[in-house]
Amino acid sequence: MPSHTWNEVGLWGRSVRANTAAKNADLLAAQGKGFSYGPTHNLHMLLFAASYDGQGAVATQAGKDYRKYAGDAQFEATTLIRFGRFDEVLALNHRPDNGASAAIYDFAKGYAMLKSGDLAGAETTLKTLQGYIATTKDKIRFHPAKTVVGVLTHILAGEISVTQGDTEAALEAFTQAVSLEDALDYDEPEPLPFAARHWLGQTLLDAGQPSKAEAVFRDELKDHPHNGWSLHGLQQSLAARGMDDPAVNEDLQTSWARADIWLSGAKF
């Protein structure tokens, strides 16, 4: 699939087009026209690329289609979190039976609770996730579920700390999330449609540490080139110090040309 190459070099729009074509071929094959190869993989690739391209409608629909096809709502939930559609997460009622998928789904529910003002619900979810990663031997493909879900657990813990005004604890949690994310082996698409550095960088920026935020966003762009979430964070980190980089501005404008959302930060 050409989209594996497009993802690696940050040509997210091309990846979306390639995987849309693959998805459509799968639909035709279901009608006896042509053949199908890896329909769930195609949908996962589509939602992943669209998430980094800012195409929320495409990403979230691919997540829903994945759930309908595979009976697993984890990607439906995480793409909705990526695009800040918390009311839709709270309305979900398709908790997976698989332990690892259920934990990812629970993270999304807990995060949406927090963003909707239910701190107690988010804290209860956090305890559940902490219990899961302490004991699980599950796998998500070839990744230890405790590592993938560990990333999410620390993101939720950090966001709870942000809500409580404890920036130091939040930064510590997000740093731990980044460390776990960095420990994951190469996989494409990755298990999550977002990066822990989006939370770390944005929190550093909000805490008045734009130089550190800049470094985080530049590191993130090495992992996912030309993604608007990190480019916006980088642009704002520079602006906070009275700096402007035309190359960054142009990259953001080009990379975010197909996006259907307005960015207020690197994460919702």
Give the residues covered by each predicted segment.
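"A position-specific structural signal for the A-helix of alpha-solenoid helical repeats
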Residues: 1, 45, 75, 104, ...
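Solenoid-like repeat scaffolds
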Residues: 23-33, 63-70, 92-101, 130-145, ...
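TPR/TPR-like (Sel1-like) alpha-helical repeat modules
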Residues: 7, 12-25, 51, 57, ...
